[in-house]
A protein has these predicted regions:
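Alpha-helical scaffold segments that form or flank carboxylate-/histidine-based iron centers
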Residues: 6-14, 38-53, 79-83, 109-122
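Generic structural signal for well-ordered, non-transmembrane alpha-helical segments
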Residues: 18-22, 45-52, 56, 88-92, ...
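Alpha-helical bundle segments that constitute or directly flank the non-heme di-iron/ferroxidase center
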Residues: 5-34, 80-105
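Charged, compositionally biased N-terminal leader segments and the immediate start
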Residues: 1-3
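Carboxylate-rich helix-loop segments that flank metal/cofactor sites and access channels
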Residues: 53-96, 140-160
């Protein structure tokens, strides 16, 4: 490949992966001290190590993104944005899961319930997105800032 930077579509996929895994890593690290079962603790250790490695590998591509810079800190005042991002990821995953479940549904009453729940998940996603967008926590139309936020979240998660 002779391009000077990553393709836009792969940059956006990197954004999705880094954002999702950064939130996941924080949650894993916050939960770990509360686990009492040794086998589960071992699984959490493996998951934490794997996600840390994933993030380290993925953020190496950020300098090749069409835009974006590094910043190793995440200020306490942006935790609202972090928590909103977690909710946004949950809502997005819910939309995907409901859509898949509907394609597997044969019973009309089950389909109707799932469609209503899908619509609720879509609404939650929209409300959460708009909350974040209005606060400038999700700069959807500014790729450089979007990637900057991803890096800040990843570095924060790795520093815990």
């Amino acid at each position: 490949m002779n391009e000077a930077h990553l393709a836009w579509h792969e940059t956006l996929e990197l954004h999705e992966l880094v954002a999702f895994q950064s939130v996941g890593l924080v949650k894993l690290k916050q939960t770990y001290p509360h686990i009492t079962n040794n086998d589960l603790k071992t699984l959490y250790n493996e998951a934490i190590a794997t996600v840390e490695e994933n993030l380290q590998e993925l953020i190496e591509f950020f300098p090749n993104a069409p835009r974006g810079e590094k910043s190793p800190s995440l200020a306490a005042e942006v935790m609202t944005g972090f928590y909103a991002g977690d909710l946004l990821g949950f809502a997005k995953t819910s939309v995907r899961n409901y859509a898949i479940a509907i394609t597997e549904t044969a019973t009309p009453m089950v389909r109707e319930v799932l469609q209503n729940q899908l619509n609720n998940a879509i609404e939650l996603h929209a409300k959460t997105f708009h909350f974040m967008y209005e606060r400038s926590d999700y700069p959807a139309y500014n790729l450089e800032r979007l990637l900057q936020t991803d890096l800040e979240n990843a570095y924060y998660a790795l520093s815990m």
